[in-house]
């Protein structure tokens, strides 16, 4: 920074004025967004290798204008002029699946297998941005995922006059990455939010496992090299997605996959507000992520049996601790059950109100 500033001063340019020309990346600038940025900055400055993962939103939340004294929200088109700091990495693209149903079969060795069929899919393409450590030679990566259609345009449907069907795949992909926190007071909004969360989680976990396998043969030792830090409940579906990959793609048994997963996932909850402890309707979750729901259902069954064994007559405790209860999938409970480290970060004002 110092060298660049001195060079620009000699040329008669103001570095601060140049910095103001760069639009803020609309990737999440609320509390969790700032926290994630601080995590990456600190990890880089301390010399720890790390990846941060998220979605490459086209419009972020919104740009603010004041009209007649009132706030007016407009799309924040931060990518209008491109982003010179990002590098598109299509060679690391992966496929993310939604919907359909799960078919199971037993092979000749009596091992059960699960296959997702009749699904919709999108192509997750990573864009990498450098996160430079302070006064050292460490550069980590912020990997943000863009969604692209598997099939760009269906000419047959277009020729039949079904113009919406012709661009259905394109719209499915575009909607995932349009805005941060789409309105979820209706079913379509809830579905889109869950799609967003699973999209970037699935892409990121697939990427991490593939990177590990390039240099290591034994997937059972994944925890020796990889840790997934889950900030709040948004990425906690990581637990079930990692189980899916380990069992369905890498051939591990349930117990082997669970042993790896519970050593790889760490969870931090940054608020105890009810709206931040995400719950998803079971019918939505089951429809959109059928295999993931099956895995969560089995995690819940095993965990509830353990709770019943320890507290046989305490139905209230079982109801509070269960992952699936009252028609809801409780994501914080999932993360706590599966995480090898679970923390609650509470601000000082909250502590003073007697919550600890």
Model-derived features with residue positions:
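Polar, glycine-rich mid-to-C-terminal structural blocks
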Residues: 280, 284-287, 291-340
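Extended, well-ordered alpha-helical scaffold/bundle regions in very large, multi-domain proteins
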Residues: 239, 243-301
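Glycine- and acidic
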Residues: 17-27, 180-196, 219-231, 239-248, ...
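Well-ordered mid-protein domain cores that form the structural environment of catalytic cofactors
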Residues: 2-41
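Residue-level detector of conserved catalytic or cofactor/ligand-binding positions
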Residues: 344-350, 354-355
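Extended, Lys/Arg-enriched charged tracts that mediate electrostatic binding to polyanionic substrates
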Residues: 60-142, 314-325
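Function-dense linear segments that define catalytic or interfacial modules
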Residues: 1-13, 135-227
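Glycine-rich phosphate/pyrophosphate-binding loops
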Residues: 40-64, 253-273
């Amino acid at each position: 920074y110092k060298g660049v500033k001195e060079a620009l001063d000699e040329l008669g340019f103001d570095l601060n004025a140049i910095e103001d020309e760069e639009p803020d990346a609309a990737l999440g600038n609320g509390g969790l967004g700032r926290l994630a940025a601080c995590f990456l900055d600190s990890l880089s400055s301390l010399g720890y290798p790390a990846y941060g993962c998220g979605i490459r939103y086209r419009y972020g939340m919104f740009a603010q204008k004041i009209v007649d004294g009132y706030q007016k929200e407009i799309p924040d088109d931060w990518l209008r002029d491109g982003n010179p700091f990002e590098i598109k990495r299509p060679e690391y693209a992966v496929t993310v699946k939604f919907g359909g149903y799960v078919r199971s079969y037993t092979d000749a060795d009596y091992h059960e297998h699960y296959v997702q069929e009749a699904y919709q899919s999108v192509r997750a393409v990573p864009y990498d941005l450098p996160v430079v450590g302070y006064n050292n030679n460490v550069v980590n990566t912020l990997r943000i995922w863009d969604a692209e259609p598997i099939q760009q345009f269906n000419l047959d449907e277009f020729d039949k006059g079904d113009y919406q069907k012709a661009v259905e795949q394109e719209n499915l992909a575009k909607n995932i990455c349009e805005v941060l926190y789409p309105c979820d007071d209706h079913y379509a909004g809830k579905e889109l939010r869950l799609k967003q969360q699973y999209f970037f989680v699935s892409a990121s976990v697939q990427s991490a496992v593939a990177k590990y396998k390039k240099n290591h043969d034994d997937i059972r030792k994944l925890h020796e090299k990889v840790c997934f830090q889950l900030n709040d409940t948004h990425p906690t579906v990581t637990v079930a997605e990692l189980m899916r990959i380990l069992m369905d793609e890498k051939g591990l048994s349930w117990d082997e996959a669970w042993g790896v997963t519970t050593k790889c996932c760490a969870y931090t909850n940054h608020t105890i507000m009810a709206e931040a402890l995400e719950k998803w309707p079971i019918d939505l979750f089951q429809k959109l992520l059928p295999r993931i729901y099956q895995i969560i259902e089995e995690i819940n069954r095993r965990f509830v049996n353990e709770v019943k064994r320890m507290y046989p007559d305490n139905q209230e405790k079982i109801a509070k601790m269960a992952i699936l209860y009252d028609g809801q999938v409780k994501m914080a409970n999932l993360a706590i059950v599966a995480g090898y480290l679970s923390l609650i970060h509470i601000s000082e004002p909250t502590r003073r109100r007697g919550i600890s």
